[in-house]
Amino acid sequence: MVQRLTYRRRHSYATKSNQHRVVKTPGGKLVYQTTKKRASGPKCPVTGKRIQGIPHLRPTEYKRSRLSRNRRTVNRAYGGVLSGGAVRERIIRAFLVEEQKIVKKVLKIQKTKEKQAAKN
């Protein structure tokens, strides 16, 4: 006859957060073993892609004691938060904005010089 199994925790519904597997103990008994949810890993908030170089863990396992800093991040600006493509885009955009400011400034100076020349 098949051995009946009962959950070992109070949560009694077969939901995604209460997944179990049947394991045979050395004593020959069948028991439920709670399985952990599969981790999807960190995503870039801009592109939505997975951030490469960071292990896929559950959110609590990224804490200081469980994972060292060099495993939690990537060695660049916004490392471990934004993907490489998003960082590259931000750098280029910032550079172009600064260039535009300089161009505006130069045009303004040229205009004032032309006005001065027209007056004289």
Curated annotation (Swiss-Prot):
This is Large ribosomal subunit protein eL34. One of its GO terms (biological process) is translation. It comes from the Eukaryota. InterPro entries: Ribosomal_eL34 (IPR008195), Ribosomal_eL34_C_sf (IPR038562), Ribosomal_eL34_CS (IPR018065). GO terms for cellular component: ribonucleoprotein complex; ribosome. GO terms for molecular function: structural constituent of ribosome. Belongs to the eukaryotic ribosomal protein eL34 family. Keywords: Ribonucleoprotein, Ribosomal protein. The keyword Phosphoprotein does not apply.
